[in-house]
Amino acid sequence: MAKRKLIALLCAVCCAVTTTVFYAAESKAQSRQYINGTIVSIGGRSTRARQFSLIVNSYTTPGQVRELNDALQRGGQDELLRALSGMDAGRVRIGSGVGVTANAIIAEPWGEGGTKLTVFYQRDVRFFELRYGTRSQDYRIGYAEIFLDRNGRGEGTLIPAARVRLRDGNTWEVEDFGVYPARLMGLRASGRIPVG
């Protein structure tokens, strides 16, 4: 009899824990913002279109932006990469792959009730770039600018290989690796990020 009570109590505790974990995961998923659309790459002989997704877990705080700016002033792009590596604001996915961590997502008011998102991520440098010392290995940052209207629709640009420099002490200059920036089209946002 005591054994049955123990098993019943254990089952009740497991159900309570499972329910709590489920609701915590569900509320975390609801506090994300999803931005989906199409990326159109214009390069070489053909134009290529693929799916684009940005999952925003949190926006980069003004303190973190100051930290990135200080790192760029102190040691250039290498120091900026070090500072970015400690940040995780979301995920950038192109096509059907897993994607890469969006290290910084900076949100600013734009237009009439819209939002401008600036996204920085550490791009994966391919083996052949390192092996053969290609110039592209100096362009280790991915960069995107997304403009969303008040209804969560918009467009933007993405530079998959960029170099970041500081001009006049406080202006960031983003240089692409000699290719046209890709266009982000038909973007739609869903979900909300809590402010605070």
Question: Where in this protein do the model-derived segments appear?
Answer:
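N-terminal secretory signal peptides that target proteins for export/translocation
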Residues: M1-R4
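Long, low-hydrophobicity ectodomains and other hydrophilic envelope-associated domains
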Residues: Q30-G196
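Sec/Tat signal peptide C-region and signal peptidase I cleavage site
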Residues: V21-A29
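Bacterial N-terminal signal peptides
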Residues: L9-T20
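Intrinsically disordered, low-complexity segments enriched in glycine/proline and serine/threonine
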Residues: L6-A8, A29
